[in-house]
Amino acid sequence: MEKLIIAVDGTSSSGKSVIFKKVARILNYQFVDTGLMYRAFTWYCLFKNIDINNQDQIIKLLDSFDYKISDEQIFVNNINVTNKLISSEILNVINKITIIPQIRNYMVKAQQQMVKNKGYILVGRDITSVVLPNADLKIYLDCDIEIRAKRRFEQNVENKILGKSFKQIYQDLIKRDQVDKTRKIGPLVLVSDAWYIDNSYLTIDQVVDIVVNKVHQLESQK
């Protein structure tokens, strides 16, 4: 059976990474969170002490940027950066980098090149609409916003991240949805041929089972 190229988009905090990492392990596919590519490049800019306000310097750094994934570990120029990508330093400046059209074009091409060999699950913004419009399976994962906020709040409590109340998280998600759906470049959209999954009242494992069964069905038709 031939493996597929799977593209996953959807609302923030709807469980995309958690669910599709599990799906990838079961199917022996390569999971790629495309958002981490932007974080990795941001880390590289900081590592090289580039002036974050100098777009020419940032663009030039693409020439030496080497990004690889191996056994769920992320490497930039052979440095394992997996545990460095959630730092506040990166999050504070990443928006100055992602708005540069040349950076975005580079990332889109790199992501498209990545899946020349099948057996990939790519998760991220505009994956189904812009990056992989011809993917074998396109999925849009959604969830009720109140349930998303509740899950995020409970995760934070479990991980002892106590900075935000449920109400603050809920309001943040409302703003995030609005920004994602209205941004000029690569807005969040539900494309007409995407498989829409609402996981508001499904467990992670239930969604995983549904997706794995669907992939097996499609693989058998190849």
UniProtKB/Swiss-Prot annotation:
ATP binds at residues 10-18. One of its GO terms (biological process) is pyrimidine nucleotide metabolic process. It comes from Mycoplasma mycoides subsp. mycoides SC (strain CCUG 32753 / NCTC 10114 / PG1). Keywords: ATP-binding, Cytoplasm, Kinase, Nucleotide-binding, Transferase. It catalyses: CMP + ATP = CDP + ADP; dCMP + ATP = dCDP + ADP. CDD domains: CMPK (cd02020). Coiled coil: none annotated. The gene is cmk. GO terms for molecular function: ATP binding; CMP kinase activity; dCMP kinase activity. It is an enzyme of class 2 (transferase). GO terms for cellular component: cytoplasm. InterPro entries: Cytidylate_kin, Cytidylate_kinase_dom, P-loop_NTPase. The keyword Transferase applies. The keyword Transferase applies. It comes from the Bacteria. Belongs to the cytidylate kinase family. Type 1 subfamily. Its main location: cytoplasm. Its EC number is 2.7.4.25. It is found in: Cytoplasm. This is Cytidylate kinase.
